[in-house]
Regions:
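Ligand-binding clefts of soluble mixed alpha/beta catalytic domains
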Residues: 1-195
Length: 195
């Protein structure tokens, strides 16, 4: 068995560099089989249908090119729609995860972020169709759980080499834990201190 280098080389080595998950889906699935649903709505999440080795599958994937792939109320609704569609026709779902978390702030709170996140997790828990999840680069916080981890019922759970999984992004954790110490340092000192 030899890995597909076009697929493995597609993901950038630098963790902050974005990539287009739509292109990744087209590489992963059978040639010319990926059909994206709602491509102009909630661009931070890619949903679609395709074929993998001839089998029909649904795809739910974070898109790091938009809002770093973070989930917001619209992307939660988009994921729920695809889950309901695939569940109705017993189409397995592949989850491709590269999620830094949920968006936060006044705007998303007014858009009922918490309610939409809970609805997404509820829809996930009610799925009866087979699912597998792959952490491509990162999975942090509650958004990691909402993207179908093994604890949420995934039939298979895999991670890409170098994937990061945790409660929060390590850089954010350092800023939270050492904010007082970092305030007194200049920019060069901060980078040195983080390492």
């Amino acid at each position: 068995w030899e890995p597909d280098h076009e697929l493995t080389d597609f993901i950038p080595d630098k963790r902050r560099r974005g990539y287009d998950m739509r292109k990744f889906c087209k590489l992963l699935l059978d040639p010319d089989s990926f059909f994206e649903l709602q491509p102009k709505f909630a661009k931070n999440l890619v949903t679609g249908l395709g074929r993998l080795d001839g089998w029909s599958v649904g795809v739910i994937a974070n898109n790091p090119m938009f809002q770093a792939g973070a989930l917001n109320p619209d992307s939660c609704d988009k994921a729920i729609r695809l889950m309901c569609l695939c569940d109705a026709f017993n189409i397995p779902i592949i989850w491709l995860m590269d999620v830094p978390g949920f968006n936060v702030g006044r705007k998303v709170e007014h858009e009922r972020m918490l309610f939409k996140a809970i609805r997404m997790v509820e829809a996930l828990c009610n799925l009866s169709t087979p699912t597998i999840s792959v952490v491509i680069r990162k999975g942090f916080g509650l958004a990691y759980q909402a993207m179908n981890t093994s604890g949420m019922g995934a039939w298979g759970f895999y991670s890409w080499p170098g994937a990061e999984i945790g409660f929060m992004d390590p850089d954010v954790g350092v800023n939270v834990a050492y904010s007082n110490k970092l305030e007194g340092l200049d920019k060069e000192g901060r980078e040195t201190e983080r390492q």
